[in-house]
Swiss-Prot record:
InterPro entries: Znf_SWIM. This is Uncharacterized protein Rv2102. The keyword Metal-binding applies. A zinc finger (SWIM-type) spans 139-167. Transmembrane segments: none annotated.
Amino acid sequence: MSSTWYPPPSRPRPVEGGIKARSTRGAIAQTWWSERFIAVLEDIGLGNRLQRGRSYARKGQVISLQVDAGLVTALVQGSRARPYRIRIGIPAFGKSQWAHVERTLAENAWYAAKLLSGEMPEDIEDVFAGLGLSLFPGTARELSLDCSCPDYAVPCKHLAATFYLLAESFDEDPFAILAWRGREREDLLANLAAARADGAAPAADHAEQVAQPLTDCLDRYYARQADINVPSPPATPSTALLDQLPDTGLSARGRPLTELLRPAYHALTHHHNSAGG
């Protein structure tokens, strides 16, 4: 018989309006990305201890949960009067890393369409892996876990409850995973839309027309630089000159002299044009 004495387990104080897990039994995660998150936590050795937080998550002991770039914070009500403060840290990707991710996602119409419609592409992990990044935590060391409770176990039941509700929050909003890594939904979608629009634009639209200095083209100053379409002058009636003559008052057979000369002027002009001017 062991001589080590452990205090009896204490019951947590009830919470009004706490965040309760939607699942009342069985697995908590519902979508592939939240299931993947839980699976990753189990793979890195946190699985057995996560079970301690299921009852806390389902009872609504988590008072608040917030996801920011690189940090998840929560308040969890335990057996003491003051709630415990939870912090789960993960390295957020930098601007240049996200720029590479967004460029790669934008190049694939399927990825862009899925994300713009609010869904997480099933092989999005491959995009990050191809750039030397990991969307989900790769090792336990990548996570920084902290709880203000006196329990020495890591993760304690308060951290475990937070992990479960974090997975459920990923069910509701898959972009929370990306926000945890440093990119908010609005920024990601705006950058994807801009990258798609920029990539679809003709290359000629982006080419700058740089004028050469005059000293670099003096030898071509009088040469034709480009074909210029010069509109032809409007056609002038061949008898327009007759219309400019003053009235002579002369007539023949009851017709003005200018009218009698008009056919002759027309014939003369036609003959001149046919001969090549």
